[in-house]
Amino acid sequence: MALPAIPQPLLTPLTEAAIFLVFTIDEGGEQAVHDVLADISGLQRSIGFRVPAGGLAAVVGIGSDAWDRLFEGPRPAELHPFVELTGDKHHAPRTPGDLLFHIRARQMDLCFEFATVVTNRLAGAASVIDEVHGFKYFEQRDLMGFVDGTENPSGQAAYVAVTVGDEDPDFAGSSYVIVQKYLHDMSEWNSLPVEEQENVIGRSKLEDLEMDDDTKPANSHTALTVIEDESGEQIQILRDNMPFGHVGSAEMGTYFIGYSASPTVTEQMLTNMFIGNPVGNYDRILDFSTAVTGINFFVPTADFLDDPPDAPTRLVPEATFTAPISDGSLGIGSLKRSAQQ
C-alpha cells in the first residue's frame, strides 16, 4: 500500500516573521528553475538546522502559465490564472507571477537567509517582481488594529480545508493559494470612530468578537467573506495574512494569502467583496484598502518537488531549405563544372 504524499508545510502556525517572494521565469530559464525546485526541501533543512528552534518553513507555489513550462504530464485540475474582478467602485487586478515562495520563521534572519539563497540560485533564470517582508503585529492584529485570522480552521478541519483529495488523484495532498497585496489608507481609516471601524469589519476591535447577524452590516467584511455549501455548512480557507509597511513612504498594508483545497472558495469570497452580494453591496473595507496584486498558484506536495516530472522537451525548429535565386538559366554550366571537379 502506497503511503500518502507528504504535503508542504503550509499548516505551520502563524509566525513572527515572513517573506513573500514572487518570481517570473525568464525565457530559457525553465530547466534551471526546475532543478532549483527539486532542492528546496534540502535548502530548508540546511538553513533551518542552524537555528533548530527558529521554525523555518517554506512553501512553494507554481503559477498557471509556468506549470506547462516546467513539467510534463498531468496538470492540476483547477489551476488557472487569477480571475480579475471589476466592481462598480473597486478593482482586483491580475498581475504576473510564476513562482511564489512563502517563507516563515520565528525570526527574520532565517527568512532572509532562505530568501537570499533561493534568489541567488535562481539568478539568470527567474526574476523577483514582488517582495514583501511581513511581521507579527501585537496579538496577530493587522495594521488597522483588528485581529486577523480569527476564523482560521485548526487540526483536522484545517487539513480538510486546504488539501486536494480524490477529486484530483494525480495531485492528492496538494493545495491552491491565492495572494493579493493590499495597501491601506491609514489616514482615512484612523479618522473613523472605533464604532464605525467595527461596522466595517463586523467584529469588535478590542475583544475580537463577531457581531451577531442582526447587528452586523450587510456590507461588512465578515458578512461577505463567509461561504457556505448547499447544506448551509461553512466552507473554510486558511489565511496566513501578514502586515507589512514602510514608515518613510507611508506604504503599508496587509499581504493576503489564502490556502484552500479549491480556488473557487476564495474566488467566491473575492467576488462578494469586489462585485458585491448582491451585486453592488461590496465590502466596505475596500474603501480603505486597495488591492495592487492578484495571482493564483498551485502548491504541489513536498514529494512532488523532491522528485518532479521531467521538464518538457523544448522543440527545435526543423532546418528549412532555401532555394537558390534563379538567374533564368537551367544551370547546365554549373552541372558541368561540378562533374569536372
Swiss-Prot record:
Region Targeting peptide: start-end pairs: 304-341
Enzyme class: oxidoreductase
InterPro entries listed in its UniProt record: Dimeric_a/b-barrel, Dyp_perox_C, Dyp_perox_N, Dyp_peroxidase
Cellular component, GO, one term: cytosol
Main location: other
Subcellular location field: Encapsulin nanocompartment
Record's keyword terms, sorted: Encapsulin nanocompartment, Heme, Iron, Metal-binding, Oxidoreductase, Peroxidase
Cofactor annotation: heme b
Biotechnology: The 38 C-terminal residues can be used to target foreign proteins to the nanocompartment.
EC annotation from Swiss-Prot or TrEMBL: 1.11.1.-
Keyword field contains Oxidoreductase: yes
List of residues binding heme: H221
Residue positions of the active site: D148
Family statement drawn from the similarity comment of this UniProt entry: Belongs to the DyP-type peroxidase family.
Quaternary assembly: Homohexamer.
Function of the molecule: Cargo protein of a type 1 encapsulin nanocompartment. Has both general peroxidase activity and dye-decolorizing activity. Can catalyze the oxidation of both protoporphyrinogen IX and coproporphyrinogen III to their corresponding porphyrins. Also efficiently decolorizes the dyes alizarin red and Cibacron blue F3GA. This cargo-loaded encapsulin nanocompartment is probably involved in protection against oxidative damage.
Name used for this protein in its record: Dye-decolorizing peroxidase
Originating organism: Rhodococcus erythropolis (strain PR4 / NBRC 100887)
